């Protein structure tokens, strides 16, 4: 790695350790020319797959869209912002863990349903009514029954 002080091409790693969250490596480096020390952080670049929509179009994953959908379903429900952020984090991790370049929007919707089911049943039904495109009250009732069991 290039020294930020004197631009020497090669520096020496003096110390390496994991950060507290365990997702990064903190490296303490020293330049052999100017003797300055500096810290770098290294983390894996995990790619989030593109989303293939029902009509076949593709778009990059948008965390804001996910947050908006969850917030809309959870509106006026007793669920903390921290719980919502953790749910988003779990969904993103599951998307990264697929290792795929593309996933169907249905896969993302199913992940959201799973998170909402454990967070708040009313929010789950709100999201499901739009996501599963209930055509009539009967389908709505069946989903509520499934949720009870």
Curated annotation (Swiss-Prot):
Residues 49-139 form the ATP-cone domain. A zinc finger (unnamed) spans 3-34. Binds 1 zinc ion. Keywords: ATP-binding, DNA-binding, Metal-binding, Nucleotide-binding, Repressor, Transcription, Transcription regulation, Zinc, Zinc-finger. InterPro entries: ATP-cone_dom, NrdR-like_N, RNR_NrdR-like. GO terms for molecular function: ATP binding; DNA binding; zinc ion binding. Belongs to the NrdR family. HAMAP family: NrdR (MF_00440). PANTHER family: TRANSCRIPTIONAL REPRESSOR NRDR. This is Transcriptional repressor NrdR. It comes from Glaesserella parasuis serovar 5 (strain SH0165). The gene is nrdR.
